[in-house]
Regions:
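Conserved alpha-helical substructure of the radical SAM core
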Residues: 2-128, 132-136
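Radical SAM enzyme [4Fe-4S]-AdoMet core and its adjacent flexible, acidic
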Residues: 1, 136, 141-143, 147-258
Length: 258
């Protein structure tokens, strides 16, 4: 493939079932918006150090506005009419939208394949809703293996306890769960415990070390969040380099070819 040629996502999704892969290929060929993401709200009950989306309620109007339930439902209908099948519902924390239940019921009745992206801490409050209108899958952010790590990373109380309760509820409902973790300095030492939690619950897990700068003035202290690579031992590096340059088994003339 030439550098100028665009490769659609469907051709990079080797993991897709052949039927769904064919659907995505057809959608690409016919310019159908087969999938989409609805960021319902920048509200969140967590205050994660590295978040570039969350805004407190008094800041929302400074950066635009929060769409109403009716507006989201109208957009969803337009997306459906255009051919959208897969939807990711996210935030902020999407369950914090004042009309979340109304939006969710309407979207599920439209027939979308919905993935809910959430911190899981509020899921148990909507147990009846998700029993009646279950998502196709849930992608959950997991920031630690105990409440203390959540206190350090998300600056909330009982964060892990609530998230774990939400995860257990979804598993009891047989709803597929995928965990995603952003690793920063404040939870780096807990990664092994997170892995043990993932293995114990037999869940898929995607770790991530990328911390992004917000484009709308959200205060994120990158210097004290990003994981720094370990410093190299310059003496050891020089010694290794010297050994690679001088090999007693090589003939002197061969060095001219390097």
């Amino acid at each position: 493939m030439s550098e100028q040629q665009f490769e659609p996502a469907c051709r990079r999704m080797e993991w897709l079932d052949p039927f769904y892969k064919a659907v995505w290929e057809k959608a690409y060929a016919d310019a159908i918006p087969i999938s989409g993401t609805f960021e319902l709200t920048p509200r969140c009950n967590f205050n994660c150090r590295m978040c570039y989306v969350h805004l407190p309620e008094n800041e929302i109007k400074k950066h635009g506005t929060e769409l109403t339930g009716a507006e989201w439902i109208r957009i969803a209908q337009e997306a459906k009419d255009a051919g959208t099948t897969w939807l990711c519902i996210t935030g902020g924390e999407p369950l914090m939208h004042p009309e979340f239940e109304t939006i969710w019921r309407e979207l599920t009745q439209m027939g979308f394949f919905i993935t809910l992206q959430t911190n899981a801490s509020l899921l148990t409050e909507y147990e009846k809703l998700f029993e009646e209108c279950p998502p196709r899958a849930c992608k959950i952010t997991l920031y630690g293996s105990n409440d203390q790590v959540y206190r350090d990373v998300c600056r909330v109380e009982n964060g892990f306890t609530k998230a774990d309760a939400g995860i257990r509820m979804l598993r009891q409902m047989k709803i597929p769960v995928e965990l995603v973790s952003t690793v920063i300095q404040q939870n780096l030492d807990d990664v092994e415990n997170i892995i043990r939690y993932v293995e114990k619950n037999k869940l898929r897990w995607i770790p991530n070390i990328n911390v992004r700068t917000a484009g709308r003035g959200v205060d994120v202290d990158m210097e004290h969040l990003r994981i720094r690579p370990p410093k190299k031992d310059s003496n050891a590096e020089q010694e290794s380099s010297r050994k690679n340059l001088v090999d007693p088994e090589r003939k002197p003339c061969t060095y001219c070819k390097d």
